[in-house]
């Protein structure tokens, strides 16, 4: 069996009794960094005889089959990240998929996860949201990711590093427009801080006084459904790009989700694009 276990994102008091019990009972703990997990077990006074196996992006393909084999043999594996919930910006989902393909049971001991904590503290709408993970490191890839998401009408959640924060906020302001943003730093820790303001203002603030360290979560206001900035030209370009790699119907559905515009209007534009391309 595979058990996905959430660990504290800062405050050790956030570990659940069930998570602590399962960590103590596991035969193997698969984790990002064995040193960090060993330290966490010690700080939480969890006595465990489990083997600690490193499992991360760089060794996942090699370690995954070994984990599958030990679970097939009846051993219990706990999957834990350094902080928070596994599978959120880590390779854990590939292990879950492999378990399902091999009829290995999978369950979870839920708990803290930074994106949800930041969202609940942001004051932005939480009925619909999109978690985007880390902003890509390369400038072009970052710009492409922001262009791809700028029409989303739901609240967006991103991870970012202090070093790149000001540049990312400036790029967001240029692509998204000057939206409201909340930056959460060191969540649940002693120096937990939330910065609130418009993207352009926050970009200027952190150019002058950068954050030197700490894990950051950016919660950004979604696009206005009725914003005039959503031009026909932009929608047409989105359709054209997608219709090169998917059916007209699928392209219409995806652009409808991105833009919030009526399906009928998008469908007519898609027909026009299709006609012009032939």
Question: Which residue ranges define each predicted feature?
Answer:
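Glycine-rich, flexible N-terminal cofactor/catalytic loop recognition
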Residues: 1-56
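A contiguous loop/helix-start segment that scaffolds small-molecule binding in enzyme catalytic cores
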Residues: 2, 76, 155, 162-278
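Short active-site oxyanion
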Residues: 23-29, 103-107, 155-156
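Structural motif
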Residues: 32, 55, 80-82, 107-109, ...
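Alpha-helix capping/helix-boundary segments
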Residues: 35-37, 84, 114, 164, ...
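Conserved helicase motor
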Residues: 54-61, 135-138
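Glycine/small-residue-rich loop that forms an oxyanion/phosphate-binding "nest" at active or ligand-binding sites
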Residues: 64-113
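Class I SAM-dependent methyltransferase SAM-binding "motif I" and its flanking Rossmann-like core
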Residues: 94-152
């Amino acid at each position: 069996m595979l058990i996905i276990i959430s660990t504290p994102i800062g405050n050790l008091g956030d570990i659940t009794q069930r998570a602590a019990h399962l960590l103590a009972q596991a035969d193997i703990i698969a984790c990002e960094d064995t040193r960090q997990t060993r330290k966490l077990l010690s700080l939480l006074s969890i006595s465990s005889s489990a083997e600690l196996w490193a499992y991360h992006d760089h060794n996942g393909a090699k370690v995954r089959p070994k984990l599958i084999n030990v679970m097939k043999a009846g051993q219990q594996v706990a999957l834990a990240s350094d902080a928070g919930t596994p599978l959120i910006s880590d390779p854990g989902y590939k292990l879950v998929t492999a378990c399902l393909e091999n009829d290995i049971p999978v369950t979870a001991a839920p708990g803290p996860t930074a994106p949800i904590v930041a969202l609940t503290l942001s004051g932005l709408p939480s009925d619909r949201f999109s978690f985007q993970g880390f902003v890509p490191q390369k400038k072009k890839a970052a710009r492409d990711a922001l262009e791809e998401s700028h029409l989303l009408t739901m609240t967006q959640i991103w991870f970012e590093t202090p070093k790149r924060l000001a540049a990312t906020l400036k790029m967001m302001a240029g692509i998204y427009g000057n939206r409201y943003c909340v930056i959460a730093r060191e969540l649940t820790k002693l120096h937990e801080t939330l910065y609130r303001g418009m993207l352009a203002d926050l970009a200027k603030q952190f150019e002058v006084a950068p954050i030197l360290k700490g894990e950051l979560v950016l919660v950004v206001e979604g696009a206005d459904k009725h914003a005039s900035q959503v031009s026909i030209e932009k929608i047409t370009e989105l359709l054209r790009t997608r219709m090169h790699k998917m059916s007209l119907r699928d392209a219409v559905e995806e652009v409808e989700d991105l833009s919030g515009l009526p399906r009928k209007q998008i469908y007519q534009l898609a027909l026009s694009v299709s006609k012009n391309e032939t």
